[in-house]
């Protein structure tokens, strides 16, 4: 059990750093007011990877600790529902209704599409 916890924690450490670097890099190229797009991007990337990995796991034996490292740890820290929720609350609070609906719509639709693409890619590979 301790080793599994260590794997999840290490994955979370890596995922949190990747998310920070992604946001930092995004902020260097775009205005801070568009930082919500970085949240959409990390959630899309995470959706693809989780769809891919968990579909592969239905056919191939993936090490339990590696799966926990990747899915629970890394993807859990990389993707974020709390930031998504906060950004939408800020949009509503500032009366930015179009950004609110755009963010919700893009996040849900694109994340579903990329999750299915991950599943489909995994099926093609095996």
Swiss-Prot record:
Coiled coil: none annotated. Keywords: Cell inner membrane, Cell membrane, Ion channel, Ion transport, Membrane, Metal-binding, Sodium, Transmembrane, Transmembrane helix, Transport. The chain crosses the membrane at residues 5-25, 34-54, 71-91, 100-120. One of its GO terms (cellular component) is plasma membrane. It catalyses: fluoride(in) = fluoride(out). Its main location: membrane. Fluoride-specific ion channel. Important for reducing fluoride concentration in the cell, thus reducing its toxicity. This is Fluoride-specific ion channel FluC. The gene is fluC.
